[in-house]
């Protein structure tokens, strides 16, 4: 098992970073949505991490021709998707598995979606059940709740009106993809807006998705093929956030992160840092599918904060935020975050158990935790095979020495994380 030793940073840093991993959510969607076109899509700066390369591989198994040169990808789909001769391996990616459920539900053929041991333990009923209710044939372990999942595509899905009990961009996206091949207009609603890359990208490609006065997304079935993509994938704000926290916890430090998506549903964690006292500036430069620009983060005194709203907008950043909270003045509290229990690990448990090793005072709740800020102490951290836990506590190592066990998981989303971390010294 690979281990990562991080030494305390003894000097401030002032850097610009333009090599942070490309956005994972957008990269997944670029690969998948290209299948709705009948022309070649051109994707620059595609994320070349394990999860997104697995998605490219699945797209290829479904019949598309792929040319790749580093992070530049061309995808030429076939007129109809091909039934694969082998299982479709999503690796560690819940996004890939759940979105492919929606995409494949109405594709003629049989498909088996599987993944690594962590993904095979994550709940899939939240997406499989609503898809089944509109005619999809999906089965799996534990009464259809766990992968491997077996999908037999049906020719025509029923249009639906669905108010989701779970605020999840993955569930929403799966239902939207299924609705594109339904035999009428479908309506989808969530209680709290989740990240909206799917809606933005599909509308940009020519699909019709409209919000009505009742808060439903009205999804019109496709009449033909969508336009191909010609896109440069921006920097991932969730990956960039580790270095925002690095600046926030390191005295007199500053970081400028270049070419990030500034989508409001993706920068909420930066707004929380702002509320904690950190200086955060957003500099928008362009808007193609997504607003894109730079984010500047400057160290300032950290104060405790309560986080209970817009949780779906910062669910991936909460482990890193917990490091800032541990070094802030006063108490911080996270609530309404039960979704953390079913991520790559039980992230509430993973965060608080590792904070305990760092001698941080905390209280754990079913839907979050409270942290008494002050200091961190050196510890040997168990990542639980979760890339965000591994990277969050690696950033904590800038404040005090830290050893992280099982760091191979970082490759799933941010292959050059260690290289950028080393550049701070």
Swiss-Prot record:
Coiled coil regions in record: none
Localization per Swiss-Prot or TrEMBL: Cytoplasm
Biochemical pathway: Metabolic intermediate biosynthesis; chorismate biosynthesis; chorismate from D-erythrose 4-phosphate and phosphoenolpyruvate: step 6/7
Catalytic activity: 3-phosphoshikimate + phosphoenolpyruvate = 5-O-(1-carboxyvinyl)-3-phosphoshikimate + phosphate
Main subcellular location: cytoplasm
Molecular function GO labels: 3-phosphoshikimate 1-carboxyvinyltransferase activity
Matching CDD domains: EPSP_synthase
Binding locations of 3-phosphoshikimate: 24-25, 29, 168, 170, 316, 343
Positions annotated as active site in the UniProt record: 316
Any single Gene Ontology cellular-component annotation: cytoplasm
Described function: Catalyzes the transfer of the enolpyruvyl moiety of phosphoenolpyruvate (PEP) to the 5-hydroxyl of shikimate-3-phosphate (S3P) to produce enolpyruvyl shikimate-3-phosphate and inorganic phosphate.
UniProt subunit comment: Monomer.
Protein name: 3-phosphoshikimate 1-carboxyvinyltransferase
């Amino acid at each position: 098992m690979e281990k990562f030793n991080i030494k305390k940073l003894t000097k401030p840093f002032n850097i610009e970073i333009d090599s942070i991993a490309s956005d994972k959510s957008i990269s997944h969607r670029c690969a998948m949505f290209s299948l709705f076109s009948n022309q070649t899509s051109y994707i620059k700066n595609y994320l070349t991490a394990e999860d997104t390369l697995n998605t490219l591989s699945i797209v290829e198994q479904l019949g598309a021709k792929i040319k790749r040169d580093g992070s530049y990808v061309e995808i030429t789909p076939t007129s109809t998707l091909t039934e694969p001769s082998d299982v479709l391996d999503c690796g560690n990616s819940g996004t890939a598995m759940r979105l492919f459920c929606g995409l494949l539900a109405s594709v003629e053929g049989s498909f088996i979606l599987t993944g690594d041991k962590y993904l095979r333990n994550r709940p899939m009923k939240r997406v499989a059940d609503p898809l089944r209710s509109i005619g999809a044939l999906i089965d799996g372990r534990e009464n259809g709740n766990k992968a491997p999942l077996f999908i037999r595509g049906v020719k025509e899905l029923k249009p639906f009106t669905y108010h989701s009990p779970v605020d999840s961009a993955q569930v929403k996206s799966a239902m939207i993809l299924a609705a594109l091949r339904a035999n009428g207009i479908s309506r989808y609603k969530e209680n709290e807006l989740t990240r909206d890359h799917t809606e933005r990208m599909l509308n940009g490609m020519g699909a019709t998705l409209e919000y009505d006065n009742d808060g439903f997304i009205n999804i019109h079935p496709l009449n033909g093929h969508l336009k191909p993509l010609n896109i440069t994938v921006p920097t991932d704000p969730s990956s960039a956030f580790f270095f925002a926290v690095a600046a926030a916890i390191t005295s007199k430090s500053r970081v400028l992160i270049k070419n990030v998506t500034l989508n409001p549903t993706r920068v909420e964690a930066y707004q929380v840092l702002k509320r904690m006292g950190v200086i955060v500036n957003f500099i928008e430069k362009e808007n193609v599918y997504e607003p894109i620009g730079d984010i500047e983060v400057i160290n300032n005194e950290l104060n405790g904060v309560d986080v209970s709203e817009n949780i779906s907008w910062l669910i991936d950043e909460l482990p890193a935020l917990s490091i800032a909270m541990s070094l802030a003045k006063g108490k911080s509290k996270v609530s309404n975050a039960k979704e953390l229990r079913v991520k790559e690990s039980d992230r509430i448990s993973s965060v608080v158990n590792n904070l305990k090793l760092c001698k941080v005072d905390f209280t754990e709740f079913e839907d979050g935790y409270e942290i008494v800020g002050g200091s961190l102490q050196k510890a040997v951290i168990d990542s639980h095979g979760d890339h965000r836990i591994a990277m969050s506590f690696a950033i904590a190592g800038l404040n005090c020495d830290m050893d992280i066990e099982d760091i191979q998981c970082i490759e799933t989303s941010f292959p050059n994380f260690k290289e950028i971390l080393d550049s701070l010294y």
